[in-house]
Design a protein with these regions (language model features):
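Hydrophobic scaffolds flanking metal-cofactor catalytic centers in soluble metalloenzymes
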Residues: 1-119, 123-142, 147-150, 154-165
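Tandem repeat scaffolds
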Residues: 156, 164-286
Length: 287
C-alpha cells in the first residue's frame, strides 16, 4: 500500500482537480494533465514542488492505488489508449479509497493486542483486496461508503483494544473535537481518541501520543516537534506530510519522515500541558 510512482501513469497529476490556493499555484480541472507532468509521467518540478507553490502535491499519497490502476486494472496508459482515459480517472479514486482501508486493516493485523479479532480483520482485508482486483466496471459499482462502514466496525474495535493498553488516559475522548490551534504542548495524550479531530495548527510539541487513535484527524500545520507518535494507530503518511515536525519527532516505523521537515533538534520542552481549545490570537497573513 505504498505509492510506486515509477509504475504509475501520473494519475494523481491528471485525474484529480485542484484549485489555486496555498497548496497549489494554479487551478486544474479533473481529467486535465498538470502542465508539470512530463511525457514519461514524471513530475518536471518534483525536486522543487514546495518552492514552486505546490506543497499540496508533497502531502498527497495514493496508498499504492496509482500503480494498481495503471498496471493491473488497465495495463495501458491514457495516452496510449485515450478511449479508456475517462473511465481510468473515475476508477482511480475508488481504488484509492479501498487501498486506504487496506492500509488500516494491515496495520490492525500487525498489532499483538488485536489477536482476538485477527480472523475478522484478515477476512475484511481479503475482501477489500478482492474488490481492488475487479474490472473497471465492477470497481465503479462498488459501494465504497457501505464497505468503509463495515470495515470501520473492526477499526473501532482495534482502537478500543489499543487505547485500553496504552497506559495513559485511555478514556480521553476527543473524537471529532475542534482543537484548531489548541495549546497541547507536552500534553499526555496516550490512548486518546482523536478520531476525526480538527488539530489544524495545534501546538503538539513534545506531546505524548503513544497509543492514540488518529484516524481521520486533520493535522494540517500542526506542530509535532518532539512529539512521540510511536504506537499511535491509523496515522497515515498524508497526515504526517501535512504536519510540521523535526528531528526529535518520533513516528511509527511504517511512516517516513517528510523531506521538508527540518533536521534540527527543538529547544527545551515546556511543562506538560492539558487539552485546551483556547485558540491563539490570529496572526496577520502575508500577501
Amino acid at each position: 500500500m505504498r505509492a510506486d510512482c515509477a509504475n504509475c501513469f501520473g494519475l494523481c497529476c491528471v485525474a484529480l482537480p485542484f484549485a489555486a490556493s496555498a497548496d497549489f499555484a494554479i487551478s486544474k480541472d479533473a481529467g486535465r494533465p498538470c502542465p508539470n507532468l512530463r511525457d514519461d509521467f514524471r513530475c518536471g518540478i518534483h525536486a522543487r514542488l514546495r518552492d514552486s507553490g505546490f506543497p499540496g502535491c508533497t502531502v498527497y499519497d495514493c496508498f499504492g492505488a496509482g500503480q494498481k490502476v495503471s498496471q493491473v486494472t488497465f495495463g495501458r496508459s491514457w495516452r496510449d489508449d485515450p478511449a479508456t482515459a475517462a473511465q481510468m480517472f473515475e476508477v482511480f479514486p475508488v481504488v484509492r479509497h479501498l487501498h486506504e482501508l487496506l492500509w488500516y486493516l494491515d496495520e490492525a493485523m500487525s498489532l499483538p493486542v488485536t489477536r482476538p479479532i485477527h480472523a475478522e480483520l484478515r477476512a475484511a482485508f481479503e475482501e477489500t483486496e478482492r474488490l481492488t482486483m475487479g474490472a473497471p466496471g465492477d470497481l465503479l459499482g462498488v459501494d465504497v461508503a457501505a464497505h468503509r462502514d463495515k470495515v470501520n466496525t473492526l477499526l473501532l474495535r482495534t482502537s478500543e483494544l489499543v487505547r485500553a493498553s496504552a497506559g495513559g488516559r485511555a478514556s480521553a475522548d476527543h473524537r471529532g473535537a475542534d482543537l484548531i490551534g489548541a495549546r497541547l504542548r507536552g500534553a499526555d495524550l496516550r490512548g486518546a481518541n482523536l478520531r476525526g479531530a480538527y488539530l489544524i495548527g495545534a501546538d503538539l510539541r513534545g506531546a505524548d501520543l503513544r497509543g492514540a487513535d488518529l484516524i481521520g484527524a486533520d493535522l494540517r500545520g500542526a506542530d509535532l516537534g518532539g512529539a512521540d507518535l510511536t504506537g499511535s494507530v491509523f496515522l497515515t503518511q498524508v497526515q504526517v506530510n501535512a504536519a510540521r515536525g523535526d528531528a526529535a519527532t518520533k513516528l511509527p516505523p511504517a511512516l517516513t519522515r517528510p523531506a521538508h521537515w527540518p533536521a534540527t533538534q527543538p529547544g527545551p520542552a515546556a511543562a506538560p500541558g492539558r487539552v485546551s481549545t483556547r485558540r491563539p490570537r490570529p496572526r496577520r497573513r502575508r500577501g
